[in-house]
Amino acid sequence: MGKKQNRKTGNSKTQSASPPPKERSSSPATEQSWMENDFDELREEGFRRSNYSELREDIQTKGKEVENFEKNLEECITRITNTEKCLKELMELKTKARELREECRSLRSRCDQLEERVSAMEDEMNEMKREGKFREKRIKRNEQSLQEIWDYVKRPNLRLIGVPESDVENGTKLENTLQDIIQENFPNLARQANVQIQEIQRTPQRYSSRRATPRHIIVRFTKVEMKEKMLRAAREKGRVTLKGKPIRLTADLSAETLQARREWGPIFNILKEKNFQPRISYPAKLSFISEGEIKYFIDKQMLRDFVTTRPALKELLKEALNMERNNRYQPLQNHAKM
Protein backbone atom coordinates (compact mmCIF):
# COMPACT_ATOMS: atom_id res chain seq x y z
CA MET A 1 0.00 0.00 0.00
CA GLY A 2 2.85 2.36 0.75
CA LYS A 3 4.35 1.74 -2.70
CA LYS A 4 1.03 2.51 -4.36
CA GLN A 5 0.73 5.74 -2.45
CA ASN A 6 4.27 6.66 -3.42
CA ARG A 7 3.45 5.87 -6.98
CA LYS A 8 0.30 8.00 -6.79
CA THR A 9 2.34 10.83 -5.29
CA GLY A 10 4.92 10.47 -8.01
CA ASN A 11 2.29 10.47 -10.68
CA SER A 12 0.62 13.53 -9.23
CA LYS A 13 3.95 15.29 -9.16
CA THR A 14 4.63 14.30 -12.72
CA GLN A 15 1.21 15.52 -13.77
CA SER A 16 1.70 18.80 -12.00
CA ALA A 17 5.15 19.13 -13.41
CA SER A 18 4.14 18.36 -16.97
CA PRO A 19 2.64 21.20 -18.94
CA PRO A 20 -0.98 21.14 -19.90
CA PRO A 21 -1.79 19.48 -23.16
CA LYS A 22 -2.40 22.69 -24.85
CA GLU A 23 1.07 23.86 -23.94
CA ARG A 24 2.79 20.70 -25.22
CA SER A 25 5.11 21.06 -28.12
CA SER A 26 4.57 18.91 -31.10
CA SER A 27 8.20 17.82 -31.45
CA PRO A 28 8.90 14.12 -31.91
CA ALA A 29 10.78 13.88 -28.66
CA THR A 30 7.94 15.53 -26.85
CA GLU A 31 5.37 13.22 -28.38
CA GLN A 32 7.43 10.21 -27.44
CA SER A 33 7.61 11.46 -23.85
CA TRP A 34 3.88 11.93 -23.83
CA MET A 35 3.26 8.39 -25.06
CA GLU A 36 5.47 6.89 -22.35
CA ASN A 37 3.68 8.84 -19.64
CA ASP A 38 0.29 7.70 -20.91
CA PHE A 39 1.45 4.06 -20.92
CA ASP A 40 2.65 4.35 -17.36
CA GLU A 41 -0.70 5.71 -16.26
CA LEU A 42 -2.56 2.94 -18.03
CA ARG A 43 -0.26 0.30 -16.56
CA GLU A 44 -0.70 1.60 -12.99
CA GLU A 45 -4.47 1.69 -13.35
CA GLY A 46 -4.55 -1.90 -14.64
CA PHE A 47 -2.34 -2.97 -11.77
CA ARG A 48 -4.67 -1.35 -9.25
CA ARG A 49 -7.69 -3.14 -10.74
CA SER A 50 -6.03 -6.57 -10.84
CA ASN A 51 -4.58 -6.18 -7.35
CA TYR A 52 -7.98 -5.25 -5.93
CA SER A 53 -9.55 -8.27 -7.55
CA GLU A 54 -6.89 -10.55 -6.16
CA LEU A 55 -7.19 -8.93 -2.77
CA ARG A 56 -10.94 -9.37 -2.79
CA GLU A 57 -10.59 -13.02 -3.76
CA ASP A 58 -7.97 -13.45 -1.08
CA ILE A 59 -10.27 -11.82 1.49
CA GLN A 60 -13.14 -14.09 0.45
CA THR A 61 -10.87 -17.11 0.69
CA LYS A 62 -9.66 -16.02 4.09
CA GLY A 63 -13.27 -15.43 5.17
CA LYS A 64 -14.20 -18.93 4.13
CA GLU A 65 -11.18 -20.25 5.96
CA VAL A 66 -12.22 -18.30 9.03
CA GLU A 67 -15.75 -19.70 8.75
CA ASN A 68 -14.36 -23.20 8.39
CA PHE A 69 -12.06 -22.60 11.31
CA GLU A 70 -14.98 -21.35 13.39
CA LYS A 71 -16.96 -24.45 12.44
CA ASN A 72 -14.02 -26.67 13.31
CA LEU A 73 -13.57 -24.76 16.54
CA GLU A 74 -17.24 -25.21 17.41
CA GLU A 75 -16.94 -28.89 16.61
CA CYS A 76 -13.86 -29.11 18.81
CA ILE A 77 -15.66 -27.29 21.60
CA THR A 78 -18.62 -29.66 21.20
CA ARG A 79 -16.27 -32.63 21.28
CA ILE A 80 -14.50 -31.27 24.31
CA THR A 81 -17.86 -30.71 26.01
CA ASN A 82 -18.95 -34.25 25.14
CA THR A 83 -15.59 -35.56 26.27
CA GLU A 84 -15.92 -33.75 29.57
CA LYS A 85 -19.42 -35.13 29.94
CA CYS A 86 -18.17 -38.62 29.15
CA LEU A 87 -15.31 -38.17 31.59
CA LYS A 88 -17.75 -37.08 34.24
CA GLU A 89 -19.94 -40.10 33.54
CA LEU A 90 -16.86 -42.31 33.59
CA MET A 91 -15.85 -40.87 36.94
CA GLU A 92 -19.36 -41.54 38.25
CA LEU A 93 -19.19 -45.08 36.88
CA LYS A 94 -15.77 -45.49 38.44
CA THR A 95 -17.17 -44.32 41.77
CA LYS A 96 -20.13 -46.70 41.44
CA ALA A 97 -17.78 -49.50 40.42
CA ARG A 98 -15.67 -48.81 43.51
CA GLU A 99 -18.80 -48.85 45.67
CA LEU A 100 -19.98 -52.07 44.02
CA ARG A 101 -16.53 -53.57 44.54
CA GLU A 102 -16.70 -52.70 48.21
CA GLU A 103 -20.21 -54.15 48.44
CA CYS A 104 -19.02 -57.29 46.66
CA ARG A 105 -16.15 -57.60 49.10
CA SER A 106 -18.56 -57.16 51.97
CA LEU A 107 -20.94 -59.72 50.48
CA ARG A 108 -18.06 -62.11 49.82
CA SER A 109 -16.95 -61.72 53.40
CA ARG A 110 -20.49 -62.36 54.63
CA CYS A 111 -20.79 -65.36 52.29
CA ASP A 112 -17.53 -66.74 53.64
CA GLN A 113 -18.83 -66.29 57.16
CA LEU A 114 -22.12 -67.96 56.22
CA GLU A 115 -20.24 -70.83 54.57
CA GLU A 116 -18.18 -71.26 57.71
CA ARG A 117 -21.33 -71.22 59.83
CA VAL A 118 -23.09 -73.66 57.47
CA SER A 119 -20.03 -75.90 57.48
CA ALA A 120 -19.95 -75.77 61.26
CA MET A 121 -23.69 -76.54 61.40
CA GLU A 122 -23.23 -79.42 58.95
CA ASP A 123 -20.46 -80.78 61.12
CA GLU A 124 -22.71 -80.45 64.15
CA MET A 125 -25.58 -82.14 62.29
CA ASN A 126 -23.30 -84.96 61.17
CA GLU A 127 -22.09 -85.33 64.72
CA MET A 128 -25.70 -85.31 65.94
CA LYS A 129 -26.59 -87.92 63.30
CA ARG A 130 -23.69 -90.09 64.41
CA GLU A 131 -24.71 -89.66 68.01
CA GLY A 132 -28.33 -90.36 67.03
CA LYS A 133 -27.35 -93.55 65.21
CA PHE A 134 -25.19 -94.59 68.13
CA ARG A 135 -28.05 -93.79 70.51
CA GLU A 136 -30.51 -95.76 68.36
CA LYS A 137 -28.16 -98.73 68.30
CA ARG A 138 -27.69 -98.47 72.04
CA ILE A 139 -31.46 -98.20 72.58
CA LYS A 140 -32.01 -101.15 70.27
CA ARG A 141 -29.40 -103.17 72.14
CA ASN A 142 -30.99 -102.20 75.43
CA GLU A 143 -34.43 -103.14 74.12
CA GLN A 144 -33.09 -106.45 72.87
CA SER A 145 -31.38 -107.05 76.19
CA LEU A 146 -34.56 -106.15 78.05
CA GLN A 147 -36.58 -108.37 75.73
CA GLU A 148 -34.17 -111.25 76.28
CA ILE A 149 -34.29 -110.72 80.04
CA TRP A 150 -38.08 -110.55 79.99
CA ASP A 151 -38.30 -113.65 77.81
CA TYR A 152 -35.88 -115.40 80.15
CA VAL A 153 -38.04 -114.45 83.11
CA LYS A 154 -41.12 -115.70 81.25
CA ARG A 155 -39.46 -118.84 79.95
CA PRO A 156 -40.95 -121.19 82.61
CA ASN A 157 -44.40 -119.74 81.92
CA LEU A 158 -47.16 -121.44 79.96
CA ARG A 159 -50.10 -119.52 78.54
CA LEU A 160 -53.53 -121.18 78.34
CA ILE A 161 -55.92 -119.55 75.86
CA GLY A 162 -59.66 -120.16 75.62
CA VAL A 163 -60.25 -121.65 79.10
CA PRO A 164 -63.78 -120.60 80.20
CA GLU A 165 -64.06 -118.37 83.29
CA SER A 166 -66.20 -119.23 86.31
CA ASP A 167 -67.84 -116.87 88.79
CA VAL A 168 -65.44 -117.58 91.64
CA GLU A 169 -61.84 -118.43 90.83
CA ASN A 170 -58.75 -118.73 92.96
CA GLY A 171 -55.32 -120.27 92.70
CA THR A 172 -56.48 -123.67 93.84
CA LYS A 173 -59.32 -123.80 91.37
CA LEU A 174 -57.01 -122.76 88.53
CA GLU A 175 -54.52 -125.46 89.54
CA ASN A 176 -57.34 -128.00 89.42
CA THR A 177 -58.25 -126.72 85.95
CA LEU A 178 -54.65 -127.28 84.81
CA GLN A 179 -54.69 -130.80 86.25
CA ASP A 180 -57.92 -131.51 84.38
CA ILE A 181 -56.29 -130.34 81.13
CA ILE A 182 -53.27 -132.57 81.71
CA GLN A 183 -55.43 -135.60 82.61
CA GLU A 184 -57.69 -135.07 79.61
CA ASN A 185 -54.97 -134.48 77.02
CA PHE A 186 -51.65 -135.81 78.39
CA PRO A 187 -52.38 -138.74 80.76
CA ASN A 188 -48.92 -140.24 80.22
CA LEU A 189 -47.30 -136.95 81.21
CA ALA A 190 -49.38 -136.84 84.38
CA ARG A 191 -48.13 -140.30 85.38
CA GLN A 192 -44.48 -139.69 84.45
CA ALA A 193 -43.86 -136.16 85.75
CA ASN A 194 -44.47 -134.41 89.02
CA VAL A 195 -46.14 -131.15 87.99
CA GLN A 196 -44.86 -128.43 90.28
CA ILE A 197 -46.51 -125.04 89.88
CA GLN A 198 -44.93 -121.90 91.29
CA GLU A 199 -47.79 -119.54 90.41
CA ILE A 200 -50.99 -119.51 88.36
CA GLN A 201 -53.35 -116.59 87.61
CA ARG A 202 -55.55 -114.94 85.03
CA THR A 203 -54.24 -111.99 82.98
CA PRO A 204 -55.24 -109.23 83.12
CA GLN A 205 -56.07 -109.66 86.78
CA ARG A 206 -59.16 -107.42 86.73
CA TYR A 207 -62.26 -108.99 85.24
CA SER A 208 -64.30 -107.05 82.66
CA SER A 209 -67.77 -108.04 81.51
CA ARG A 210 -67.13 -106.23 78.24
CA ARG A 211 -64.41 -108.69 77.28
CA ALA A 212 -65.68 -111.03 74.55
CA THR A 213 -63.19 -113.84 75.19
CA PRO A 214 -61.97 -115.45 78.43
CA ARG A 215 -58.86 -114.02 80.01
CA HIS A 216 -55.67 -116.01 79.49
CA ILE A 217 -54.22 -118.15 82.26
CA ILE A 218 -50.49 -117.81 82.99
CA VAL A 219 -48.92 -120.88 84.62
CA ARG A 220 -45.40 -120.51 86.04
CA PHE A 221 -43.68 -123.85 86.62
CA THR A 222 -40.77 -124.34 88.94
CA LYS A 223 -38.79 -125.84 86.04
CA VAL A 224 -38.65 -124.91 82.35
CA GLU A 225 -38.56 -128.58 81.38
CA MET A 226 -42.17 -129.11 82.47
CA LYS A 227 -43.42 -126.32 80.22
CA GLU A 228 -41.44 -127.71 77.28
CA LYS A 229 -42.81 -131.22 77.86
CA MET A 230 -46.38 -129.92 77.80
CA LEU A 231 -45.79 -127.92 74.60
CA ARG A 232 -44.14 -130.91 72.95
CA ALA A 233 -47.06 -133.14 73.96
CA ALA A 234 -49.49 -130.51 72.60
CA ARG A 235 -47.69 -130.50 69.24
CA GLU A 236 -47.84 -134.28 69.08
CA LYS A 237 -51.53 -134.40 69.97
CA GLY A 238 -52.45 -131.56 67.62
CA ARG A 239 -55.74 -130.65 69.35
CA VAL A 240 -55.99 -129.75 73.04
CA THR A 241 -59.39 -129.61 74.78
CA LEU A 242 -60.99 -128.94 78.14
CA LYS A 243 -64.24 -130.84 78.68
CA GLY A 244 -64.40 -131.32 74.93
CA LYS A 245 -63.97 -127.63 74.05
CA PRO A 246 -60.79 -126.64 72.16
CA ILE A 247 -58.17 -124.56 73.94
CA ARG A 248 -54.62 -123.53 73.06
CA LEU A 249 -51.28 -123.83 74.83
CA THR A 250 -48.46 -121.42 73.98
CA ALA A 251 -45.27 -120.11 75.51
CA ASP A 252 -45.64 -116.92 77.52
CA LEU A 253 -43.44 -114.41 75.70
CA SER A 254 -42.84 -110.65 75.74
CA ALA A 255 -44.95 -108.42 73.48
CA GLU A 256 -41.97 -107.76 71.19
CA THR A 257 -41.26 -111.46 70.78
CA LEU A 258 -44.92 -112.18 70.10
CA GLN A 259 -44.98 -109.46 67.45
CA ALA A 260 -41.84 -110.88 65.86
CA ARG A 261 -43.50 -114.30 65.75
CA ARG A 262 -46.67 -112.87 64.22
CA GLU A 263 -44.65 -111.26 61.45
CA TRP A 264 -43.50 -114.69 60.34
CA GLY A 265 -47.17 -115.73 59.88
CA PRO A 266 -47.63 -115.18 56.09
CA ILE A 267 -44.23 -116.71 55.28
CA PHE A 268 -44.90 -119.64 57.61
CA ASN A 269 -48.23 -120.40 55.92
CA ILE A 270 -46.73 -120.28 52.39
CA LEU A 271 -43.85 -122.57 53.38
CA LYS A 272 -46.28 -124.97 55.08
CA GLU A 273 -48.43 -125.17 51.92
CA LYS A 274 -45.32 -125.99 49.85
CA ASN A 275 -44.22 -128.66 52.38
CA PHE A 276 -41.03 -126.91 53.57
CA GLN A 277 -41.86 -128.07 57.14
CA PRO A 278 -41.50 -124.63 58.77
CA ARG A 279 -41.27 -124.07 62.52
CA ILE A 280 -41.17 -121.07 64.84
CA SER A 281 -38.59 -121.78 67.54
CA TYR A 282 -37.74 -119.87 70.69
CA PRO A 283 -37.80 -116.94 70.89
CA ALA A 284 -38.85 -115.92 67.36
CA LYS A 285 -36.72 -117.81 64.86
CA LEU A 286 -38.09 -119.24 61.63
CA SER A 287 -36.70 -122.56 60.44
CA PHE A 288 -37.54 -124.73 57.43
CA ILE A 289 -35.95 -127.42 55.29
CA SER A 290 -34.22 -126.20 52.12
CA GLU A 291 -32.12 -128.43 49.88
CA GLY A 292 -32.15 -131.14 52.52
CA GLU A 293 -30.87 -128.87 55.31
CA ILE A 294 -32.61 -127.02 58.14
CA LYS A 295 -32.14 -123.26 57.75
CA TYR A 296 -32.65 -120.78 60.62
CA PHE A 297 -33.54 -117.09 60.27
CA ILE A 298 -33.79 -114.55 63.07
CA ASP A 299 -35.38 -111.79 60.92
CA LYS A 300 -36.79 -111.09 57.45
CA GLN A 301 -33.65 -109.37 56.18
CA MET A 302 -31.66 -112.52 56.77
CA LEU A 303 -34.29 -114.46 54.82
CA ARG A 304 -34.19 -111.88 51.98
CA ASP A 305 -30.44 -112.29 51.69
CA PHE A 306 -30.88 -116.06 51.60
CA VAL A 307 -33.50 -116.16 48.82
CA THR A 308 -31.54 -113.81 46.50
CA THR A 309 -29.48 -116.81 45.36
CA ARG A 310 -32.56 -119.04 45.04
CA PRO A 311 -34.88 -117.59 42.34
CA ALA A 312 -37.69 -120.12 42.83
CA LEU A 313 -37.90 -119.50 46.58
CA LYS A 314 -37.58 -115.75 46.02
CA GLU A 315 -40.55 -115.76 43.64
CA LEU A 316 -42.55 -117.86 46.10
CA LEU A 317 -41.96 -115.49 49.04
CA LYS A 318 -41.80 -112.20 47.09
CA GLU A 319 -45.12 -110.77 48.25
CA ALA A 320 -44.79 -112.01 51.83
CA LEU A 321 -41.31 -110.53 52.24
CA ASN A 322 -42.45 -107.15 50.93
CA MET A 323 -45.50 -106.91 53.21
CA GLU A 324 -45.44 -104.07 55.75
CA ARG A 325 -45.37 -104.93 59.41
CA ASN A 326 -48.66 -104.90 61.24
CA ASN A 327 -49.91 -105.86 64.64
CA ARG A 328 -52.68 -108.13 63.39
CA TYR A 329 -52.32 -111.65 64.74
CA GLN A 330 -52.09 -114.29 62.00
CA PRO A 331 -52.48 -117.87 63.24
CA LEU A 332 -49.93 -120.44 62.19
CA GLN A 333 -52.59 -122.93 61.11
CA ASN A 334 -52.91 -124.49 64.59
CA HIS A 335 -49.17 -125.14 64.65
CA ALA A 336 -47.94 -125.17 68.23
CA LYS A 337 -45.51 -122.40 69.21
CA MET A 338 -42.49 -122.64 71.42
From Swiss-Prot:
InterPro entries attached to this UniProt entry: L1_C, L1_dsRBD, L1_RRM_dom, L1_trimer, Transposase_22
Pfam families: Tnp_22_dsRBD (PF17490), Tnp_22_trimer (PF17489), Transposase_22 (PF02994)
Subcellular location: Nucleus, Nucleolus; Cytoplasm; Cytoplasm, Cytoplasmic ribonucleoprotein granule; Cytoplasm, Stress granule
Segment forming the signal sequence: none
Keyword S-adenosyl-L-methionine recorded: no
Biased composition (Polar residues): 8-17, 26-35
Gene Ontology terms describing biological process: retrotransposition
Molecular function terms, GO-annotated: identical protein binding; nucleotide binding; single-stranded DNA binding; single-stranded RNA binding
Free-text comment about domains: The coiled coil domain mediates homotrimerization. The RRM and the CTD domain are both required for proper RNA-binding activity.
Sequence similarity: Belongs to the transposase 22 family.
PANTHER family named in the record: L1 TRANSPOSABLE ELEMENT-RELATED (PTHR11505)
Subunit composition and interactions: Homotrimer (via coiled coil domain). May also form larger homooligomers. May interact with DDX39A, HNRNPA1, SERBP1 and YBX1. Interacts with TEX19 and UBR2. Interacts with MOV10. Interacts with APOBEC3D; this interaction inhibits LINE-1 retrotransposition.
Protein name as annotated: LINE-1 retrotransposable element ORF1 protein
Originating species: Homo sapiens (Human)
